[in-house]
Structures are given as structure tokens and as C-alpha cells.
Design a protein with these regions (language model features):
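Soluble catalytic domains of membrane acyltransferases
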Residues: 90-244
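Membrane-anchoring hydrophobic helices of lipid-metabolizing enzymes
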Residues: 1-121, 126, 156-160
Length: 244
């Protein structure tokens, strides 16, 4: 990594910390709104906005331009809400008025079976609450994540995630050879797996997705077959007033 890139990463992270500091006098509701609107504005200027439009047209061919724009704008705003909520993730999880849980009876059934499972979800709403929630409900869980190129942000996000865990039995591991080893060891030691499975991958099995050839990871399916693990979907949505 060049010195220029390292300095750029440091400045990006420093700018983020300054923005969070400047938002301190405002309420969490107002701060979250400011960050989300900023994300939407900046997102529209990025190359990813056009990529999102093209993808939406493939997935939702019957929607008009206005409807597609609304979906994308909401997505950018959700990312902004997520980033801000990450700054107080531990407190967010303790706020019973902010998070509504449905399907606890399913978790109780899994507990009674006393056998590890694979929880899977996608990057929707605030996906960061999933692993700490499982951990708080006595599910020892290992989660795989993709590291961020900016190591200052990567270290910060990792700390926020681990600080939100109630026990030392759950863990986060970066995608790669190390994570494969740690996840397998976790399963052998009766720990569950949590995965977000909606990201495009440069490696893996080629599948047909909305008429397009894409690659996706299927390693977790091989683990599920080998160890006879159940696959448990988790749905996470953002409600009005940023409740989850």
C-alpha cells in the first residue's frame, strides 16, 4: 500500500470522525436523517448509482424510472442510517423500543434441538444487529465478513461489532482461508454460522441470476451437507421512525 493511499484513508476516517463530532449536539433522530440524506446525495453522484439503476431494471422490468429512483434513494439512505447506527450499536441493541423481534418461537425450537445451524440473511435494514442479537439470545455464533480496504474504517467497524457482543463465545472473522478454518472449528465446537449471502463474488460457483451469469459462494452449503446443519433465514426490515 502506497503512502498516498494510507494518507487518503486516514483523511477519510478523520473526516468521518469530525462529522460525527459535529452531530453530537443534535438528537440521534436528526443526526441519522442528516447522514442518510447526505449518503443519498453523494450516492447519486457515484458510478454505483447507475449500476443500481441497471440492476433494478433487470429485476423490476415493469417499474418506471420514478419508482426505480425511489428504490435506489431509499437504499442510499438506509446505508446512511446504518453507518450512523454503527456508532452506537451496543446502545441500539439495548433499546427495546427500537428493535421488534418476530419468530422467537423458531429460536426456542432451535435451542431445544441443541445443534448448530446456519443463519443467513442479506444486506437489508441494519444487518449489523443480527449477530449481536443471536449472541444475546445464547446462540454462540461465528460470522464471516468482508474487510474494508480502508483499514482505519475496518478496524473501527470491527471494534463496534465486537463491543456489541454480550459474550466471548461469538466472533467475527474476515473472509478468506482463516475464516474457513475458524468457521469449521466453530461448527465442530457447536457454534452457529451467520452469513450475508447477497454480494457479488469474483470466485465461486457460476449460477443463472435473473438471466445473468454470476458467481456466488456455495462453501456454506457444503458445510451444511457435511455436518447436516439446518439453514435458517433471517429477515431484517427498517420500520417507520427507524425502528428495526
Amino acid at each position: 500500500m502506497t503512502l498516498f493511499i494510507s494518507i487518503r484513508y486516514l483523511l477519510e476516517f478523520f473526516l468521518f470522525k469530525i462529522i460525527i463530532f459535529l452531530l453530537f449536539p443534535f438528537s440521534k433522530k436528526m443526526s441519522s436523517k442528516i447522514i442518510s440524506k447526505s449518503f443519498m446525495f453523494l450516492g447519486k453522484l457515484s458510478k454505483y448509482n447507475q449500476i443500481a439503476k441497471n440492476n433494478c431494471k433487470i429485476v423490476f422490468p415493469d417499474l418506471n424510472e420514478k419508482e426505480i429512483t425511489k428504490i435506489i434513494n431509499n437504499s442510499w439512505q438506509n446505508l446512511g442510517h446504518n453507518l450512523f447506527e454503527l456508532t452506537f450499536l451496543k446502545k441500539l441493541l439495548k433499546d427495546k423500543h427500537k428493535i421488534e423481534i418476530k419468530g422467537l418461537e423458531v429460536l426456542e425450537k432451535i435451542k431445544k434441538e441443541n445443534f448448530p445451524v446456519i443463519f443467513f440473511s442479506i444486506h437489508s435494514s441494519n444487518w449489523e444487529v443480527c449477530v449481536p442479537f443471536l449472541d444475546q439470545n445464547n446462540f454462540k455464533t461465528g460470522a464471516i465478513y468482508r474487510h474494508i480496504n480502508n483499514f482505519f474504517f475496518n478496524r473501527y467497524i470491527y471494534k463496534q461489532r465486537t463491543d456489541a457482543l454480550k459474550t466471548n463465545d461469538s466472533f467475527y472473522t474476515p473472509k478468506g482461508k482463516v475464516s474457513a478454518k475458524e468457521i469449521l472449528e466453530g461448527v465442530i465446537n457447536s457454534k452457529n454460522i451467520f452469513l450475508l449471502v447477497d454480494q457479488k463474488d469474483s470466485a465461486g460457483t457460476e449460477v443463472n441470476f435473473f438471466g445473468k451469469k454470476v458467481k456466488t459462494q456455495t462453501g456454506f452449503l457444503k458445510i451444511a451437507r457435511k455436518y447436516k446443519l439446518k439453514l435458517i433465514p433471517m429477515k431484517n426490515i427498517r420500520l417507520p421512525n427507524n425502528k428495526l
